[in-house]
């Protein structure tokens, strides 16, 4: 008989076992706390000096299709920092996969799945979804994200248009690991803004127990926002508001000059005929109508006089 062939592949000695033992959430939480502590050390949030892949207690992966600008792509930056590993088309990911073809929302019910197998995203352009081969990015746990607002500079303020790092962070917040979201968002100057914009919603989703409850929380939020729209408070002295001009002394709907002076004069001094009953009121209305007609003709006559003087 020949020699026994040496073991190969993920199950080989020294390699990663094919089936990992179940991970306790308590031990995972301790690893998350250690990773957060390492990320806040001096120099950890400055880019290349950040923590390596061993600093994160779970796997982060990404299918990168090359649709985005490499200088603005948050997924590529995380990959350069060693926080995310790139997958090729056709590779299967065993953890939670954020995909537009998912059938249910990510929820706290996925907490153990994320702790055990991690999260993967699809880095593609929102404008090219029709040509994205989602069937070649395989996974057993496809999920969607509920209503959230983007804070990245490209799609700031637009719902659902999250970048890769925002998708990772949202998933961690929903399943109950917000410290992991902080670790990733610290790599971007605008990262904290994502949590500030969506704090209320993320807390609502994290308090749910199932995908159905997350869907219900989303629907309730959107219904309340539609029923009670809040008027925008505008600071007239805010130079960064984006408004080119504005007059705080006049309502926006006003289309003609106010006639407060004429109305106040008429109300304060109605004339001697006002004490004589209804007949006097109709007479006053006729006089006011004639007066308004004369005022309407006056600007036209003045304009004709100006044009005549210009011709002369």
UniProtKB/Swiss-Prot annotation:
Belongs to the TDD superfamily. TSR3 family. The modification Phosphothreonine is found at residue 261. Residues 1-21, 224-312 are annotated as: Disordered. One of its GO terms (cellular component) is cytosol. Aminocarboxypropyltransferase that catalyzes the aminocarboxypropyl transfer on pseudouridine at position 1248 (Psi1248) in 18S rRNA. It constitutes the last step in biosynthesis of the hypermodified N1-methyl-N3-(3-amino-3-carboxypropyl) pseudouridine (m1acp3-Psi) conserved in eukaryotic 18S rRNA. Keywords: Cytoplasm, Phosphoprotein, Ribosome biogenesis, rRNA processing, S-adenosyl-L-methionine, Transferase. Its main location: cytoplasm. It comes from the Eukaryota. Its EC number is 2.5.1.157. One of its GO terms (molecular function) is S-adenosyl-L-methionine binding. S-adenosyl-L-methionine binds at residues 74, 122, 145, 160. It catalyses: an N(1)-methylpseudouridine in rRNA + S-adenosyl-L-methionine = N(1)-methyl-N(3)-[(3S)-3-amino-3-carboxypropyl]pseudouridine in rRNA + S-methyl-5'-thioadenosine + H(+); N(1)-methylpseudouridine(1248) in human 18S rRNA + S-adenosyl-L-methionine = N(1)-methyl-N(3)-[(3S)-3-amino-3-carboxypropyl]pseudouridine(1248) in human 18S rRNA + S-methyl-5'-thioadenosine + H(+). This is 18S rRNA aminocarboxypropyltransferase. It is found in: Cytoplasm. GO terms for biological process: enzyme-directed rRNA pseudouridine synthesis; maturation of SSU-rRNA; rRNA modification. The modification Phosphoserine is found at residues 24, 259, 264, 282. It holds the Pfam family Fer4_RLI. Disulfide bonds: none annotated. InterPro entries: RNaseL-inhib-like_metal-bd_dom, Tsr3-like, Tsr3_C. It is an enzyme of class 2 (transferase).
């Amino acid at each position: 008989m020949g020699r026994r062939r040496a073991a190969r592949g993920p199950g080989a000695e020294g390699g990663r076992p094919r089936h990992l033992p179940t991970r306790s959430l308590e031990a995972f939480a301790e690893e998350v706390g250690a990773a957060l502590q390492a990320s806040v050390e001096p120099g950890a949030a400055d880019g290349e000096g950040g923590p390596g892949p061993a600093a994160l207690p779970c796997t982060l992966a990404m299918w990168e299709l090359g649709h985005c600008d490499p200088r603005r792509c948050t997924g590529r930056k995380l990959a350069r920092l060693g926080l995310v590993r790139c997958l090729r088309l056709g590779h299967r990911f065993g953890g939670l996969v954020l995909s537009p073809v998912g059938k249910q929302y990510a929820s706290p019910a996925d907490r153990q799945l994320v702790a055990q197998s991690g999260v993967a995203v699809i880095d593609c352009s929102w404008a090219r979804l029709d040509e994205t081969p989602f069937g070649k990015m395989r996974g057993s746990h496809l999920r969607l994200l509920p209503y959230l607002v983007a804070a990245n500079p490209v799609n700031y303020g637009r719902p659902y248009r999250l970048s890769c790092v925002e998708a990772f962070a949202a998933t961690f917040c929903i399943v109950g690991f917000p410290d992991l979201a902080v670790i990733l968002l610290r790599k971007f100057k605008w990262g904290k803004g994502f949590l500030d914009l969506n704090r209320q919603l993320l807390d609502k989703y994290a308090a749910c127990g199932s995908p159905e409850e997350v869907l219900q929380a989303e629907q309730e939020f959107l219904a309340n926002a539609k029923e009670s729209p809040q008027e925008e408070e505008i600071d007239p002295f805010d130079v960064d508001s984006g408004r080119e001009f504005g007059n705080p002394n006049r309502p926006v709907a006003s289309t003609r000059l106010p006639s407060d002076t004429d109305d106040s004069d008429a109300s304060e001094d109605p004339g001697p005929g006002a004490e004589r009953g209804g007949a006097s009121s109709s007479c006053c209305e006729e006089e006011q109508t004639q007066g308004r007609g004369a005022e309407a003709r006056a600007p036209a006559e003045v304009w004709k006089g100006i044009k005549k003087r210009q011709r002369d």
